[in-house]
Amino acid sequence: METIGNLWLYVAFFGIVIVMLLVDFLGFKQKQGQDVSIKQAAYWSVAWVSVAVLFGGGLWLYLQQTVGVTLANQKTMEYFAGYLLEKSLAIDNVFVWLMIFAAFANPAALQRKILLYGVLGAIVLRTLFIFIGAWFVQEFSWVLYIFGAFLVYTGFKFLKGQEEETNIEDIKILKWLRKHMRITPQLDGDKFFVRQNGLLWATPLFLVLILVEASDVIFAVDSIPAIFAVTSDPFIVLTANLMAILGLRAMFFLLAGAASKLHYLPYGLGIILLFIGAKMLLLDVFHMPIWISLSFIVIVLAITAYLSLRHNKKQLHS
């Protein structure tokens, strides 16, 4: 499979990831019981987006010197298209986390710890999924058509509003954990496990961590096939995907109070998934330039945001 990735690019990228995770951890470290403010979350969200943009710019400069302007332009547009796609799909992930935290009544201080581990787990799992997916696409090109059909199906579900309400207690993995593990009835600070009468017990916080990780695995099933419609280069898929999820902690606290205000987001995501799925299904018939995909994603997200703002204003005046 053709890729611009080499050892030094991967080392540089994961070096940036490690440094930014440390900065994120130290920057978001709050005093016990102190909540993350909307202002602080907004600053960190802007910082993460800025890092993603700067990485894209640095990638373009590097590729311009090594492989030429034409390929540099193409790969950079693929990166930004993939980043926007993954960032928009990640918003739905945030809403599920809100539901999980609300169901377990976790305070903000514990949410920060869970999300830190959640993002770290997502980095490992998504990296694994991406390279497995890249291998499948290289060895079995027909897999792209399965991805395309699945994305079209998911897009229709978004448009028809079939994102049904989920009762946390009905989730199978939670039932299995409660049945096969010793779970304490209450939290014990920020501990995942405690010893009682010589036996190891898991706390409800451990259940929350498992649900957060499981939800990301489920959403990765949507998002990773979608980005393979934008590019088949595993380096671009990986960097765009991880850059999008690295800022999820800040995005979570920023959107925590605005979940109900993004009224038209599911419809916008549905349209984008339909577009991406159709593009995959028509690979052998029509090759769509990457700038069209990038422009389409930007326009749909902009229209979605505009319509949501109008909807909110109408509700305020009604």
Regions found by a protein language model. Give the residues of each.
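Multi-pass alpha-helical transmembrane bundle typical of ion/small-solute transporters
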Residues: 1-318
